[in-house]
Amino acid sequence: MTLEWWFAYLLTSIILSLSPGSGAINTMTTSLNHGYRGAVASIAGLQTGLAIHIVLVGVGLGTLFSRSVIAFEVLKWAGAAYLIWLGIQQWRAAGAIDLKSLASTQSRRHLFQRAVFVNLTNPKSIVFLAALFPQFIMPQQPQLMQYIVLGVTTIVVDIIVMIGYATLAQRIALWIKGPKQMKALNKIFGSLFMLVGALLASARHA
């Protein structure tokens, strides 16, 4: 892979990571409700799910999955249902802003696992990666190293972007003056979770 091809993929990866989706919403809500440490656990979970998708694409299962309507539909509805459930939980969340008490109700391990599931149950992610990676793979060069470079680039970029979303959420938290504002913010993010879930449910297999 040439440096020019890598820069082209880097730009593509940045644009894709910046696009608001379930991962960004999950990171911001976790940062708001559980603080920066909770957000770090969530980001680690998102990258674990993304890494699993990348490995599946690298061994060829991504292409097989993208051609299976049944597998796509099963994962799609599981992901949509999970996001809508998260949205309902977020909508009903209390307006508390005491991060110490919140940390005791949901451990960082739970936040990590939740984030892994958010990414794993997004079939559009693995289908998109299966279509995107081959566009930047040079067949005359060793493919394994190229897949590793693309995968590491994807994860590093997404980590940086998600840290940005978590930081943005912390900035928003500075403007929250009481439980009523926090409750309203939880309803907004809960609605966004449900919206993304509905959009995922409406996705069609290519």
Swiss-Prot record:
Q: Where in the cell is it found?
A: Cell membrane
Q: Does the keyword Nucleotidyltransferase apply?
A: no
Keywords attached to this Swiss-Prot or TrEMBL record, sorted alphabetically, are: Cell membrane, Membrane, Transmembrane, Transmembrane helix, Transport
Residues forming coiled coils: none
**GO biological process, any:** threonine transport
Please list the GO terms describing molecular function.
homoserine transmembrane transporter activity; threonine efflux transmembrane transporter activity
Q: Residue span of the signal peptide, if any?
A: none
Topology term for the membrane: Multi-pass membrane protein
Q: Which Pfam families match?
A: LysE
Task: Indicate the transmembrane segments per the record.
Answer: 5-25, 45-65, 68-88, 117-137, 148-168, 182-202
Q: Specify the superkingdom.
A: Bacteria
What NCBIfam families does this protein map onto?
2A76, PRK10520.1
Q: State what protein this is by name.
A: Homoserine/homoserine lactone efflux protein
State the organism named in the record: Escherichia coli (strain K12)
The major lineage groups are: Bacteria, Pseudomonadati, Pseudomonadota, Gammaproteobacteria, Enterobacterales
- Quote the gene name from the UniProt entry: rhtB
